[in-house]
Amino acid sequence: MSTHEVTLAIDMADGLSADAGETRALGSLLAEDYRSADPFPHIVIDGILPEGLIRKILDHFPQKRQDKDVVFDIGYGGQHKRQVMPEECDGFVREFFHFMNSKPVLSFVEGLTGIEGLLPDPYFSGGGFHETTRGGKLGIHADFRINGQLNLQRRVNLLIYLNETWSDDWKGHLELWDKGMTTCRASVAPIWNRCVVFSTDAQTWHGHPDELQTPDGVARRSIALYYYTASKHILDEVPNLSTMYQARPDDPAAIKSEARRFKTDEYLRDWLPPILFRGINRLRRLPGRIARMRRS
């Protein structure tokens, strides 16, 4: 398994910020390795967050169960696993998760994966902090495809591990399996500040299915974020209209005519083939061009 040493240039001087152009360029540098990875597009990046930032994140990890924690004790589908919602964490943690849903991070992931138009999930469905304790596991699985709350397609998973020390004897490695579930093609130790990004579809099989053998009081902790795309089929359901204008009853005739023109243009843009709409616009501009030629 190959890894990359890369740190996002995150400025902590006034909140959390980064340059989206720089993060996209950084992702693009890693894109070829990501897209050619076996058994499906993925990458392992060590040192993804500045040390001061990830140290502070761990310091603010909620030690006690929160009211909205999602707890899994269902065997192969998740055992001794706890999901902590960012909304129940302190202000710094909330700010961090909001940053991870912002343009600089989305730009990095877009540059890395080649998937444009990525969208975050402000509700963190399935995401947030994850914690698994001794005896816990998560069976090999492919993730849900559609976010039912947002009606978006899940495309990319991003995980960052928060485990300062980790022994191979403790198990808990993230396993990536081939589509036929015949061979584990990659095994990733969940070590400190290691990030795993991978594309997700119906056959991106992954999990950590062996029971954790951590000492008492030691948990496997991670940050989990998921990114989505909208479907172009929305154009089959909703008219592709831009801003629609309406004149007021007492507006002058010229204003009413202008508003009708805007509205008519939008309906024509939605109804007509693009080449025909462009032709109509050229014809509309023709009288003005003729008048200018005569004046000159």
Regions found by a protein language model. Give the residues of each.
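N- or domain-start disorder-to-order transition segments that initiate the globular core
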Residues: 1-31
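Catalytic core of Fe(II)/2-oxoglutarate
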Residues: 5, 147-154, 164-296
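Non-heme Fe(II)/2-oxoglutarate
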Residues: 22, 31-112
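Histidine-centered active-site/metal-ligand motif
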Residues: 42, 141, 206
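A structural signal for short, well-ordered beta-strand segments and their strand-loop junctions
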Residues: 44, 119-122, 128, 197-198, ...
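Non-heme Fe(II) oxygenase catalytic core, chiefly the N-lobe of the double-stranded beta-helix
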Residues: 59-62, 88, 99-154, 163
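A structural signal for the main folded, soluble domain(s) of proteins
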Residues: 77-83, 112-121, 130, 134-137, ...
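Eukaryotic charged/polar low-complexity linker/IDR segments
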Residues: 157-159
